[in-house]
């Protein structure tokens, strides 16, 4: 399997960037793993073979296998379609935070853990998501809520633990959701702006997608997180539901 590049965008009107007479192309993001798995029929094949669970991880983190047995056990006992390993995260830290998003619900950091446990028992619905929110979006999202921003709780950490892209999927559910959606994960753009008005790009940007956005392909299926320590160490230079272990 090989990921294809996508055309780069030169401005807010999404005009295609051209360099030296050729369309400029960039990677589409690791969310393409879902489309590639579906295109090659692998989740459906694995489900027919009786395989139940799939682990996805990034090779910049050498420690994910420390968590594998525990996160598999949690995934089975909770009936999760996707389970994310999460780590303690400081407020404002440049790591995505895993949150329970409930439309129309206020966010109260003093009640977040209780809400997450209630959500586990209730199960996910089409209006609720346990999902990663990127750090540059998390604080602005929370500023308009009673939380007032991404602030520490009594532990000194953010109530929204860090996503490290160690993800366990239930193969049967994954195959069904990818068959329904074609494995197409919702896309976004994250341009570097050249002006305060955010009207010009510093350089061409790209449409991209992320593998941890799989919960956005799910309705009714339960997606959660397992909070763990000492399962994350970068091998490169760095530039909701809750179960404690």
Regions found by a protein language model. Name each.
Residues 1-51:
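Conserved N-terminal catalytic core of the sugar/cofactor nucleotidyltransferase
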Residues 46-58, 63-67, 72-245:
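Catalytic core of tubulin tyrosine ligase-like
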């Amino acid at each position: 399997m090989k990921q294809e590049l996508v055309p780069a965008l030169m401005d807010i009107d999404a005009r295609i960037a051209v360099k030296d007479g050729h369309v400029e192309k960039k990677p589409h993001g690791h969310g393409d793993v879902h489309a590639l798995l579906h295109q090659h029929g692998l989740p459906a094949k694995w489900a027919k073979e009786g395989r139940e669970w799939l682990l996805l991880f990034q090779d910049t983190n050498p420690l994910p296998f420390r968590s594998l047995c525990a996160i598999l056990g949690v995934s089975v006992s909770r009936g999760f379609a996707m389970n994310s390993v999460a780590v303690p995260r400081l407020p404002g830290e440049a790591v995505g935070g895993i949150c329970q998003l409930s439309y129309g619900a206020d966010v109260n950091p003093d009640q977040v853990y209780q809400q997450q446990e209630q959500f586990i028992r209730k199960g996910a619905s089409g209006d609720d998501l346990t999902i990663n929110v990127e750090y540059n979006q998390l604080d602005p999202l929370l500023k308009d809520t009673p939380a007032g921003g991404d602030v520490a709780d009594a532990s000194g950490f953010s109530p929204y633990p860090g996503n490290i892209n160690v993800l366990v999927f239930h193969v049967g559910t994954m195959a069904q959701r990818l068959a329904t959606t074609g494995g197409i994960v919702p896309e976004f753009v994250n341009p570097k702006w050249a002006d305060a008005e955010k009207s010009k790009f510093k350089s061409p940007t790209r449409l991209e997608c992320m593998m941890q956005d799989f919960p956005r392909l799910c309705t009714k299926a339960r997606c959660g997180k397992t909070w763990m320590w000492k399962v994350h160490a970068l091998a490169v230079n760095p530039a909701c539901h809750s179960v404690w272990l």
